Amino acid sequence: MEGSRAAAHSVQVELGSDFPELRDAVQRVCDDFPGEYWRKKDEAQEYPKEFVQALTENGFLGALIPEEYDGSGLPLRAAAVILETINASGCNGGAAHAQMYIMGTLLRHGNAEQKRKYLPGIARGELRLQAFGVTEPTTGSDTTKLKTRAEKKGNDRYVVTGQKVWTSRALYSD
């Protein structure tokens, strides 16, 4: 009975086998942030600044930023491996994923000047670009039903219409 109860509380996570060196490097960072760290952060309702900084210093949050902008230039699967390893270790990938992915908008839609100005700072952790507002009063976080729209007016202006309920990580973004 006791053995089956222990097994019921054990979580087995099977990770892919790609990017083994990356997995090991991420795991080494995660090992410095044991369960006690996360319990204290949770109890105090604090953002894990130290963890995010450690990921930044090791280049993981700039993984998808091209090398020409001081990032690692890794493929999307490598970023998934980073988050997969963070979460499997018991750390909180939610504190890191936005910094890794939001800059994709800048890569796709930013002009050359904006990329040169912002991407190196994001890659080095000098600029935090991780706030986002998805949740709306009538659609929740179902991004396929969002009603907020941005309409271009002229060459350099947009008019945004709609409502957002929360902006995640606004306090930890520049």
What feature does the model see in each segment?
Residues 1-21:
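Intrinsic disorder at enzyme termini
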Residues 34-173:
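Glycine-rich flavin
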Residues 8-12, 23-26, 49, 62:
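Low-complexity, intrinsically disordered short peptide segments enriched in small/polar/basic residues
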Residues 18-32:
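A non-catalytic, amphipathic alpha-helix used as a structural packing/dimerization or gating element
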